[in-house]
C-alpha cells in the first residue's frame, strides 16, 4: 500500500492546521511532570509544544519519515511501532494523546485497548478527531477513501462506547464546527471515586 505519510512528511507541518493548544493542555491536565505518549504523533507538530510542560514525550508512529521530522525537533523520543501493539510495559504513561490519527489506525478497537493498557491508573487519554457527522468531514472521508488511505472515521459516540467497555470514564467536547475531543480517565484503585 502507498504510504501517504512518508511522502507528506517534509511539508506536513506546513499544510496541516494548528490545533487548539489551550484546550489540549486543559484536557491533558498540563503542565504536570508526566510521561506523555503521542500515539500516531507523526512529525511531533502537537507534542513539540507540549514537551516543555511535561518531563518526557514519546511519539509513536509507523512512518519513518514522519518520525525523522519529529527527531529533528529535539526533546521528543520517536518510536516506530503499530499503535495496536505498543512496545511498552503496562501502566507506563501518565498521559496519552491521539490527534487527528485514530481514523488512520488499522484496528481502532485493538489500538484503544493497547492505549488503555499502557496508561497508568489515574492517567488521561485525550483523542482529537474530525466529526464525521459534519458535511465537511464527510467530504474529507470521501477524499481519503478515493486516495486509498484506508481511513475509517468513528463518531464520538462509538469511541466513548469502546472506552466505556474498557472501563474508562469519559468526557466529550466539540468545537461546534468539525472537531471533537474525547477525554478518558483510567480508574485508579488506590483512589476510589465515591461520587
Residue ranges and their predicted role:
Residues 33, 93-94:
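Local beta-strand N-terminus motif with an aromatic residue
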Residues 100-101:
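Short catalytic micro-motifs in class I SAM-dependent methyltransferases
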Residues 4, 8-9, 15-16, 46, ...:
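C-terminal alpha-helical "lid/dimerization" subdomain adjacent to the S-adenosyl-L-methionine
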Residues 16-34:
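Conserved alpha-helix/loop element of class I SAM-dependent methyltransferases that forms part
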Residues 109-121:
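A short glycine-rich, Lys/Arg-flanked "PGG" loop and its adjoining helix->strand segment in the class I
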Residues 97:
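A conserved beta-strand element that flanks and buttresses the S-adenosyl-L-methionine
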Residues 37-85:
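Class I SAM-dependent methyltransferase SAM/SAH-binding core
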Residues 183-195:
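C-terminal lobe and adjacent flexible extensions of AdoMet/dcAdoMet transferase-like proteins
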